[in-house]
Design a protein with these regions (language model features):
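Retroelement reverse transcriptase polymerase core
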Residues: 1-125
Length: 125
């Protein structure tokens, strides 16, 4: 485990999941084409980009998988109850869930790219 300073000055705890990532099959769920996402916003009168706050920490781990995410410090062992940052398939998992949650709006006035959402409108109200 290491602490990494983020751009905003806060700290992020990182665990090295290299071995776990090697053991897991890749989830090939496709991410949206970023160029198409940008193109879809052209000509809009209003545009908002939203970043999900601690988005990965909103996704609960399945209880049977919590022990697989265990790590040790000098004093104790811990396991994640939410999806940790650094897992190979975290982005695909997040994208899949965002598309499920936002399904009624996707392609109309909302686009999702992992933990970022673009909300557009052709009208100004």
């Amino acid at each position: 485990m290491v602490l990494v300073k983020k751009a905003n000055g806060k700290w992020r705890m990182c665990v090295d999941f290299t071995d776990m990532n090697k053991a897991c099959p890749k989830d090939s769920y496709p991410l949206p084409n970023i160029d198409a996402l940008v193109d879809s916003a052209s000509g809009c009168k209003m545009l908002r980009v939203l970043d999900a706050f601690s988005g990965y920490n909103q996704i609960k781990m399945h209880p049977r998988d919590e022990s697989k995410m265990a790590f040790m410090t000098e004093t104790c062992s811990y396991c994640y109850k939410v999806m940790p940052f650094g897992l190979k398939n975290a982005g695909a998992t997040y994208q899949r869930l965002m598309e499920k949650v936002l399904a009624p709006m996707l392609g109309r006035n909302v686009q999702a790219y992992v933990d970022d959402m673009v909300v557009t409108s052709h009208e100004r109200r």
